[in-house]
Amino acid sequence: MATTDHPGVIAPPPLIYLGFLLAGWGLAELGARPEALEAGFGWLAADFGLEMPIRRGAALTLIVGGLVLDGMAAGLFRRRGTAVEPWKPSTVLIIEGPYRFSRNPIYLGFAVTYAGLGIAMDSWVALILLAPCLLVVDRFVIQREERYLAAKFGGAYDAYRQAVRRWL
């Protein structure tokens, strides 16, 4: 039986975030339909009540911040010559840069970007769905990656795991 040199995550993490974001958008759109309003589901389309400049500023700040964090973290993988994709083998344990503060800065960046997009869409539902999205990422991506990294890098990963928090 062949062994695989990757964590075996359930799906590419960006697709998990995108799936939940699109579900939030879709539910908000359905909630705005007249038949949904009549049936009492209009709350799905409720907005934040923020004025456009405030909403745009908050959304832009979060989106840019999340993308910058993602770029910094992913750039370390490329500079160190290892794959950023979790379905490919890891050849180096990255513990510098944003990885000094979070073991998962890319997923943290995705979450911040997602929050910005939810605000840009003016959708409470999209923001509420960030919580189950993070649960799926935590249980079916991060925990699998952690088992893989512990097996691959042994004591070095265990020491890193004890020194740096999973998210923040």
Give the residues covered by each predicted segment.
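Extended, alpha-helix-rich binding/interface surfaces that flank or overlap catalytic cores
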Residues: 104
